[in-house]
Amino acid sequence: MIHKNWQELIKPTQLVVQPGTDPARKATVVAEPLERGFGLTLGNALRRVLMSSLQGAAITSVQIDGVLHEFSSVAGVREDVTDIVLNLKGVAIRMDAEGPKRVSISAKGPRVVTAGDISESAGIDVLNKDHVICHLDDGADLYIELTVNTGKGYVAADKNRPEDAPIGLMPIDAIYSPVKKVSYDVQPTREGQVLDYDKLTLKLETDGSLSPDDAVAYAARIIQDQLSIFVNFDEPESATRQDDEDDLEFNPLLLKKVDELELSVRSANCLKNDNIVYIGDLIQKTEAEMLRTPNFGRKSLNEIKEVLSGMGLHLGMDIVDWPPDNIEELAKKYEDNF
């Protein structure tokens, strides 16, 4: 059927996650190759979902002893209540269960009150414990009750006020999104001898409650789930192709040659000198074995680990009956799958 051209479109074969200065919060994710125009399409969709639709946790209301409203001050506290509330919005929280939950801060001056002073509670983890909330002078006595909840995106303060709210409870704006910054860039790339493809680069920063690569994975899953309703037909698999793949006892991707991975010249030469021809040869090597290869250093090791990770593979894997006797014939047979 001529309309089934999605089967012929090129799909990304590499997904590389490059950790930033703070690997738990910052990373660059690169996917290539993509059909021309798909970099912009997917980059924009992923960015919007990353910023708006991932689940997170945030403080939704504050109650300070002796305070009736946010336009007040607390004796012995240098910041007024408005500043305290603003600082509480910056507390990064990981929450393992559905909310709401109550936590508190109890402190006596003189001292600096930080997010690390928030009381411990099952299922709640404060990530930026050094984040400053306020400063107490000598003799100051501060007690704050906080409500923590889960949600997505941004929720205005008036939506966080419960119907039975006691006097003095101050609802605050909740920014649930664990992603703080995300941008994307699209550059041309090549596949074989063809230069007319896209390379999508996503740069993102989270609050630490979710790793950058997991954030991208969840965003992609949301998009996939939302689009599934538009597919109004079943896709019959080619019986011949399915039967052929069933005959293999391993992933056909292992038949791809390592010189097609677009590694650096040093890494590629090291693999060649070590007689590593196929991905199946490579993934059976351990990290220690690779580091014993002449001229092969930690930088090359990290490069190869990132490339394999993007393919769902890793070093040190065990493959039964590898290599197959007819490996060259099989590699040629499955080269269209790569």
Swiss-Prot record:
Keywords noted in UniProt: DNA-directed RNA polymerase, Nucleotidyltransferase, Transcription, Transferase
Quaternary organization: Homodimer. The RNAP catalytic core consists of 2 alpha, 1 beta, 1 beta' and 1 omega subunit. When a sigma factor is associated with the core the holoenzyme is formed, which can initiate transcription.
Family membership noted in the UniProt record: Belongs to the RNA polymerase alpha chain family.
Protein's name according to its UniProt entry: DNA-directed RNA polymerase subunit alpha
Acetylation as UniProt keyword: no
UniProt domain comment: The N-terminal domain is essential for RNAP assembly and basal transcription, whereas the C-terminal domain is involved in interaction with transcriptional regulators and with upstream promoter elements.
Originating species: Jannaschia sp. (strain CCS1)
GO CC terms in record: cytoplasm; DNA-directed RNA polymerase complex
Catalyzed reaction equations: RNA(n) + a ribonucleoside 5'-triphosphate = RNA(n+1) + diphosphate
Keyword Lipid metabolism: no
